[in-house]
Amino acid sequence: MQPGGHILVDDGLVDLEVQDIAGKDIVCKVINAGVIGDRKGVNVPGANLKMPFISKKDHGDLLFGIQEGFDFVAASFTRTANDIREVRKILKENGGEEIQIIAKIENQQGVDNIDEIIEAADGIMIARGDMGVEIPPEYVPVIQQKIIQKVYTAGKPVITATQMLDSMISHPRPTRAEATDVANAIFQGTSATMLSGETAAGKYPVQALQMMSRIAEHMEQNIDYNTIFKKTDRNENPDITNAIAHATCLTAIDLKASAILAVTKSGSTAHMLSLIHISEPTRRRGI
């Protein structure tokens, strides 16, 4: 921290400007005042924080997830691929090697190292709330589009999250801009859209979920996925499953197949096929 820097609280609603630093004390001037509720986040834009990625509490939470049989864990504020490797090491050492890791991209370090993070993680979450505080908001839409494309090309799932239907925390209907935001993420190729405050603390959680579902369903009915798929850049170094899935989808499109039936033992082939957005539905059958 340096004098002149800013400390942002609650997604930037409260803005503090650093005036002086004396040992462990930081004297700030309030630029934007507000009431700070419980458990609100604190952001220091531009700061390169040198602190352990996994706290003692994080370690305990991972062990709890293993004990309860979690399918996924999300790694908040992922900065480098080493952060993901650190989480994976703990999972493997404690019998949780089957748990998949979703890297949450929320700051500039994560954006700068996105390629190595995509390779190390099992999926990516574009957490736009903190990202829009750590990074100028006007940059976020372009970053979102680029990350979605990179993750899609890598054959991994990508989740677009935070403030998608934010007004529905207090109102029964979203703004038109919010509906367009959800639709645009789907058009860009996101694997999933996610609600947070709308369902965790909102007055209309069920209505928010139903609204997002309707927007997604309508968008998918009106997107030419086959054309987009043919124009999309392929992974330059595909593994066998990725290559087979890509070839299968091309064949299905050329033959105008009604569906794709994936005969699979582990489920990985069906999973890969489902990540490739084409119009033909995928059916899974185990062996």
Give short role names for the model-derived ranges.
Residues M1-D15, A81, I105-N107, A243-A257:
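Phosphate-interacting basic helix/loop segments used at nucleotide- and nucleic-acid interfaces
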